[in-house]
A protein has these predicted regions:
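Conserved phosphate-donor/acceptor-positioning beta-strand/loop module used by diverse small-molecule
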Residues: 95-115
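Conserved beta-strand scaffold positions in the cores of enzyme catalytic domains, especially
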Residues: 31, 99-101, 158-161
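Conserved substrate/cofactor phosphate-moiety recognition/catalytic segment
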Residues: 13-69
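Small-molecule kinase domains that catalyze NTP-dependent phosphoryl transfer to phosphate-bearing small molecules
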Residues: 120-171
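Pre-Walker A (Motif I) flank of P-loop NTPase domains
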Residues: 1-4, 71
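Hydrophobic anchor at the beta1->P-loop junction of P-loop NTPases
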Residues: 7
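P-loop (Walker A) phosphate-binding loop of NTP-binding proteins
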Residues: 10
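Glycine-rich phosphate-binding loop used to anchor ATP phosphates in small-molecule kinases
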Residues: 54-95, 99
Length: 181
């Protein structure tokens, strides 16, 4: 059975790194990193353009197409609104695929520090750091972390995987174990 694996977690926790590793080790899997879609939209750096509203439906369509073709999707994306998670779960269900949720977590202080230590110098990385700083920096990240924890009780099938700093391979092994369970 094909799967749509939603890899959730606070910004900078390692979702994209683990998703890339997973896709590399599972040929044919689509690494649907929504952040990589933003730069494809003209004017994406202007917050007033609401690019998320454009790329989320595109991501849903990409996931549906991939699953319909009998291939897996891994989605490394912070989502703390149940309605957004439900949309991806619905796509999986409609395409006859399993919907698997894994939430990568560290303590709040460590999660915020990991965002600050992130070395992504891509256009998206610079843009994202600028937006976070503009909207409160660590306070914004703390709020995002709290919102993620608040929705977890409503997602009983989500498996939490603890992430230690500089332990990518160990965390990847925990991810694989969570997906087998």
């Amino acid at each position: 059975m094909t799967s749509l694996i939603h890899l959730n977690g606070p910004p900078g926790i390692g979702k994209s790194t683990l998703a890339a590793r997973y896709a590399h080790r599972h040929p044919g899997t689509l690494n649907l990193d929504i952040d990589s879609l933003h730069p494809l939209v003209g004017g994406w750096e202007d917050e007033d353009n609401h690019t998320h509203e454009i790329v989320r439906p595109i991501a849903l369509a990409m996931a549906a197409t991939q699953l319909r073709g009998g291939r897996d999707v891994i989605l490394p994306q912070y989502l703390a609104r149940l309605t957004e998670i439900d949309k991806f779960e619905q796509v999986a269900r409609e395409e006859g695929a399993a919907f698997r949720e894994v939430v990568l977590l560290a303590g709040k202080t460590e999660a915020i520090a990991r965002f600050d230590r992130r070395s992504d110098d891509s256009a998206w990385g610079r843009h994202n750091r600028r937006l976070v700083a503009l909207h409160g920096g660590p306070a914004m990240l703390a709020s995002m972390y709290d919102r993620l924890l608040e929705i977890l009780p409503a997602r009983p099938d989500a498996v939490v995987v603890r992430c230690e700093p500089d332990a990518v391979e160990a965390t990847y092994a925990l991810l694989i174990e969570a997906l087998r369970g």
